[in-house]
């Protein structure tokens, strides 16, 4: 299978390593050709210190790598998802499955990121969301991690599950793409609040109170917006909330501090 990952941030790079480890013909694309050339030479990404990228991973700044791809992973920052989708659109075929791994909601439109991608690629192919408690720093060193592959089309969700699953990266499937994406976006607000708690010197009792009541609120909002209550109690919801609110790797938590 040919897989292409768009975005050389920490998460995009870690994702590309998973796919490469699984034996797929894998390409990692950067919008900056100079950065791509440097990474190809050193086999390292400064955002994932200590991780040596597989020699089999093709690192490039040429969008032509998208031709014939079976799987395309959209991994830019959330603000760049629409622009990245515009760039990928001409290369996609009906057979291609696009995986959105960025988290957030588009400013101005309030669209979920799979919706943004769908608009730009004119829904020519299926879009799946892959989300969960998955800091790139840990996936990069192959720490056991679990995520949820979500799409109303169960076949597409399982295709992504099969592409990513290995002995350190476990993938569950869900038909609730709305809930999975909302959970991944909304927990960031709570992580900021937990950072504020740390900055003010509040301890574990306070943060447990905040996280628990916040998840109840996120669940109610998510249900109103079309998500399933069950989703918010699982990996994509509570799991992601816990890791983002407590981890030393969490940028949102650090920003709150």
Language-model-derived ranges and their functions:
Residues 1-52, 58-61, 87:
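NAD(P)+-binding Rossmann beta1-loop-alpha1 motif at the extreme N-terminus of oxidoreductases
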Residues 53, 59-144, 160:
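Rossmann-like NAD(P)(H) cofactor-binding subdomain of soluble oxidoreductases
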Residues 65-68, 186, 238:
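Alpha-helix C-terminal capping/helix-to-coil transition sites in glycosyltransferase folds
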Residues 80, 91, 120-126, 144-192, ...:
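Internal alpha-helical scaffold of NAD(P)-dependent oxidoreductase catalytic cores
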Residues 247-257:
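Divalent-cation-assisted or electrostatically stabilized phosphate/pyrophosphate-binding catalytic cores
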């Amino acid at each position: 299978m040919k897989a292409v990952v768009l975005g050389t941030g920490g998460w995009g790079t870690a994702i590309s390593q998973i796919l490469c480890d699984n034996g797929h013909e894998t390409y990692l694309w950067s919008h900056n050709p100079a950065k791509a050339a440097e990474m190809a030479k050193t086999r390292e990404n400064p955002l994932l210190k200590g991780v040596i990228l597989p020699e089999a991973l093709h690192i490039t700044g040429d969008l032509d790598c998208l031709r014939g791809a079976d799987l395309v992973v959209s991994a830019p920052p959330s603000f760049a998802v629409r622009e990245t989708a515009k760039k990928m659109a001409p290369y996609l075929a009906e057979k291609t499955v696009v995986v959105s791994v960025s988290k957030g909601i588009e400013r101005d439109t309030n669209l979920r990121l799979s919706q943004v991608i769908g608009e730009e690629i004119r829904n020519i192919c299926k879009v799946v969301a892959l989300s969960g408690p998955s800091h790139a720093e840990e996936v990069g060193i192959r720490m056991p991690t679990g995520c949820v592959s979500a799409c109303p089309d169960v076949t597409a969700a399982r295709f992504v599950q099969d592409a990513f699953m290995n002995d350190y990266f476990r993938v569950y499937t869900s038909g609730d793409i709305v809930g999975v994406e909302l959970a991944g976006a909304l927990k960031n607000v709570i992580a900021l609040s937990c950072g504020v708690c740390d900055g003010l010197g509040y301890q574990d009792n306070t943060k447990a109170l905040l996280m628990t009541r916040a998840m109840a609120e996120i669940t109610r909002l998510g249900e109103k917006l079309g998500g399933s209550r069950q989703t918010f109690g699982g990996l994509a919801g509570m799991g992601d909330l816990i890791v983002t609110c407590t981890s030393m790797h969490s940028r949102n938590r650090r920003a709150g501090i």
